[in-house]
Regions:
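Bacterial N-terminal signal peptides that target proteins for export
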Residues: 48-59
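N-terminal amphipathic/hydrophobic targeting modules at extreme N-termini
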Residues: 2-16, 25, 41, 45
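Low-complexity, intrinsically disordered or signal/transmembrane-proximal segments
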Residues: 15, 29, 33-36
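C-terminal motif of bacterial Sec signal peptides marking the signal peptidase cleavage site
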Residues: 68-70
Length: 329
């Protein structure tokens, strides 16, 4: 009597582990992953190249589903450390939905430093895209608080009726209840010798810092407050900011900790709160590393009761000047 045997178990385990680790590594390093179809096709080929039993087929199907779920969320990959990323539908809504005054937190952010005059900034995420000019507003009401929201960006300029790409990469927005800041993680820039060609060049800079400014004249008259939040830079969102303000003395000081590079874990030297040209309360001071001055920092105070601070620091390191985004409440 002939017995029809079930197909034996193929060694699919390593494929499952490989595919899962690929998505996990992608999330850890915050890289966008646009080629998940390659893994899905590989899995389909595995099922066609040899017979598989029901258990194997179920496992491979589950792996494919996990890859699609994890990798399709790559546009808002984890901030790798302290700062989670916004991977919800809010990314697309920020580009397409009208302002809704029912949204929580800061509802809009005017783009001034992120895109200069005569330039265009194209943002895209989750199949949606929108082009902004200098002075246009980004709908931040749809973004999650205390998270880095990540968009793809292309910055362009029009010359003789032709749009020329200046740089491209990842556009980041960190939003709090009363303030927000933007950062640009550039991956490619225009070739200095060929305007129609792009070359790889990674650089990180802070764009706009804005929100509901605290008026210098309406600061608390006394007491002190300690703000705790995040410090993030290029490929490093795990930093912590601690900043204390003595309102009676109109003075503040703080520190940045837990960034990967020791040179970036610096003291924010004591500095006085001063009014800017619009009477907004701001603080500017020196950055210290091992008691040596290594740059500067600037913070704005935000909220009707000075609930938040947001700003940036520039730190001189062996690899040049590094920019750090700062936000705390």
């Amino acid at each position: 009597m002939t017995v029809n045997k079930m197909p034996s178990e193929p060694p699919f385990g390593r494929h499952l582990i490989f595919a899962s680790l690929t998505c996990l590594i992608d999330a850890v390093y915050k890289k966008r992953y646009h080629n998940q179809d390659v893994f899905i096709l590989s899995i389909l080929r595995m099922t066609r190249s040899k017979p598989v039993n029901r258990t194997t087929f179920c496992c491979l199907s589950l792996t494919a589903a996990l890859i699609l779920t994890a990798c399709s969320s790559g546009g808002g990959g984890s901030g790798g450390g302290g700062v989670a990323a916004d991977i919800g539908t809010g990314l697309a809504d920020a580009l397409t939905a009208p302002l809704d005054y029912k949204d929580k937190g800061l509802q809009s952010l005017m783009l001034d430093q992120s895109v200069r005059k005569n330039e265009k900034l194209k943002l895209s995420a989750q199949g949606a895209e929108k082009t902004y000019g200098n002075g246009d507003s980004l709908n931040t009401g749809k973004l999650k608080n205390d998270k880095v929201s990540r968009f793809d960006f292309i910055r362009q300029i029009e010359v003789d009726g032709q749009l020329i790409t200046l740089e491209s990469g990842e556009f980041q927005v960190y939003k709090q209840s009363h303030s927000a800041l933007t950062a640009l993680q550039t991956e490619q820039v225009q070739d200095s010798e060929d305007s129609g060609k792009m070359v790889a060049k990674r650089q990180f800079r802070i764009g706009d810092i804005a929100g509901e400014h605290t008026s210098f004249d309406k600061l608390p008259k006394g007491g002190s407050a300690t703000y705790r939040g995040t410090a993030f830079g290029s490929d490093d969102a795990g930093g912590k900011l601690t900043y204390t303000i003595d309102f009676a003395a109109k003075q503040g000081h703080g520190k940045i900790e837990h960034l990967k590079s020791p040179e970036l874990n610096v003291e924010l030297a004591a500095a006085y709160i001063k009014p800017d040209e619009k009477r907004h309360a701001v603080i500017s001071g020196s950055v210290l590393y091992n008691q040596d001055e290594k740059g500067s920092y600037s913070l704005g105070i935000f909220g009707g009761q000075a609930q938040e601070v947001a700003g940036s620091a520039e730190v001189e390191t062996a690899n040049g000047i590094q920019h750090i985004g700062l936000a705390a409440k």
